[in-house]
Design a protein with these regions (language model features):
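The beta1-alpha1 cofactor-binding region of Rossmann-like NAD(H)/NADP(H)-dependent oxidoreductases
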Residues: 43-44, 68-79, 110
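Conserved mid-core segment of classical short-chain dehydrogenase/reductases
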Residues: 101-114, 158
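A short, exposed helix-loop element centered on a Lys and neighboring polar residues
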Residues: 128-129
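A glycine-rich helix->loop->beta "capping" turn
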Residues: 58-63, 83-94, 102, 140
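Canonical Rossmann dinucleotide-binding motif of NAD(H)/NADP(H)-dependent dehydrogenases/reductases
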Residues: 3-37
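Active-site loop immediately N-terminal to the catalytic Tyr-X3-Lys motif
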Residues: 154-160
């Protein structure tokens, strides 16, 4: 049985939503009759992803929103939450999915690790802090999904 937040007319926001697992989830939500917002830093991917979602969404392009967001910046994520509220009236599902894995290893440049943590850890925290209060205020069933990767748990062979 699906979660009650996964209902027609409800709103799903997916960070890192213009490709991969994020786009697959957004496509699924649009197919359920939900309105979707994909937030992604990749400007080159958003238009094609939006067109794909509009072809699946019951309301077409009117049920699809895209936004350029760097989840490592709280102000970007808070601005996204405000924009979704203005466009769709609020959020029922937040999928904190944005993540990076630049070429690095345990002994790689400190800047790589700082960027990884800024996106993969702080991005989740920023999303939750920006969206959860209004989701709770709405008094409806809501859902926050935080995705991850086994790369964050294990070290791949050849990568010290």
């Amino acid at each position: 049985m699906p979660h009650p937040a996964m209902s027609p007319g409800n709103v799903a926001v997916i960070t890192g939503g213009a490709s991969g697992i994020g786009l697959a989830a957004a496509t699924h939500y649009a197919g359920l009759g939900m309105k979707v917002c994909i937030a992604d830093i990749g400007a080159d991917r958003r238009p094609e992803a939006a067109a794909k979602l509009a072809s699946v969404a019951r309301g077409g392009a009117a049920d699809v929103m895209t936004a350029a967001v760097d989840v490592s910046r709280f102000d970007d994520v808070a601005g996204l939450e405000t924009a979704v509220q203005k466009r769709f009236g609020g959020t029922d599902i937040l999928m904190n999915n944005a993540g990076i894995g630049p070429d690095s290893n345990s002994f790689g440049p400190l800047e790589n690790w700082q960027r990884i943590l800024a996106v993969n850890l702080w991005g989740v925290i920023h999303g939750t802090q920006a969206f959860a209060p209004h989701m709770i205020e709405r008094g409806r069933s809501g859902l926050i999904i935080n995705t991850g990767s086994k790369q964050g748990i294990t070290t791949p062979p050849g990568n010290p």
